[in-house]
Amino acid sequence: MKLIKTQDAVGHVLCHDITQIIKGVTKDALFRKGHIVTEEDIPLLLSVGKEHLYVWENDESMMHENDAAMVLLDMCKNERMSYGEIKEGKIELKSEIHGLLKVDRKALFTVNSFGQMMIATRHGNTVVNPGDKLAGMRIIPLVIKKEKMDKVRSLITSPILEIKPFVLKKAAVITTGSEVYKGRIQDTFTPVIQDKLAEFGCEMVYHAICDDDDKMVTEKINEALTQGVDIVLCTGGMSVDPDDRTPLAIKNTGANIISYGSPVLPGAMFLLSYKGEVPIVGLPGCVMYAKRTVFDLVLCRLLAKDVVTYEELCDLGEGGSVSYTHLTLPTILRV
């Protein structure tokens, strides 16, 4: 690669795309990499501010931006992803399915801190749909040392990105509360849960309404588990009131309690546990009336069979003091 004056470029091969930007009209390549410059091209090149050009001069120790973009792509791509053509040295990955995007943040940092290259992704642990852009990547200079690209490639041992499909399809909902059990009010909680599950193709296949009786709730949870449900959601009875017995009922199933309480508002009284591989979740009343709560941050992960840890829940405190009523899925979960 060498630098020459544009007026002297006739007959030379361009090393990179030449971009034209017209506000509100276009931002695209005026000439593509590999184009042989003609006399007629000179005025156009000057009109986009190109008084000098990089033209091709073979150097086996260097890698062109397009080839380097493919190396970066190879570090990111995984199953259920597709990519298009390279434009102006950049290439993008897209999702082929409705699923949960996972990002290896440490590996991503490794690449972006290596110098002269970048990968920009969506936030991890977010819901993606077919056709959604997942990431874009390129090197910063026009060419880069092959040795440098080989080195960074050797540091990334598994794909930076992954899309997990939503595989949990059968849910049990245990509705608690004496006011519902005794027919004093209508159950308005369960329909909310059904709608949220439907966003991920999950169906409520078991439903029970229980009094404020921990033994009854425990019995119904265990009954649901024997019917092979993938996830159990217990609504209500999660606060410190004397009649709220759901946390004790979940504990008495023998489930492993990950956390009772979350650093997110709405959703402080949220409970997450697992019995074997089956999540058993305690949902506070805010889930019924607030459009988005901590439940929405976690549900997409649970239905993708992505295990949520105590540390990950604790990490939600940063940004957790937010009104989720104005958010729509996909919702950001940083951990």
Which ranges hold each PLM region?
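N-terminal small/polar loop signature for handling phosphorylated ligands or for N-terminal nucleophile
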Residues: 195-235, 239-253
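Glycine-rich phosphate/nucleotide-binding loop
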Residues: 241-310
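Conserved small/polar residues in nucleotide/adenosyl-binding loops
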Residues: 325-331
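Glycine-rich phosphate/diphosphate-binding loop of Rossmann-like nucleotide-binding domains
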Residues: 160-212
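Internal, active-site/partner-interface "lid" segment
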Residues: 306-324
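Short, low-complexity N-terminal leaders and the immediately following helix N-cap/first helix
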Residues: 1-88
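Residue-level recognition of short, solvent-exposed, well-ordered loop/turn junctions
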Residues: 32, 38, 123, 127-130, ...
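Extended, charged alpha/beta regions that create polyanion-binding interfaces
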Residues: 59-166
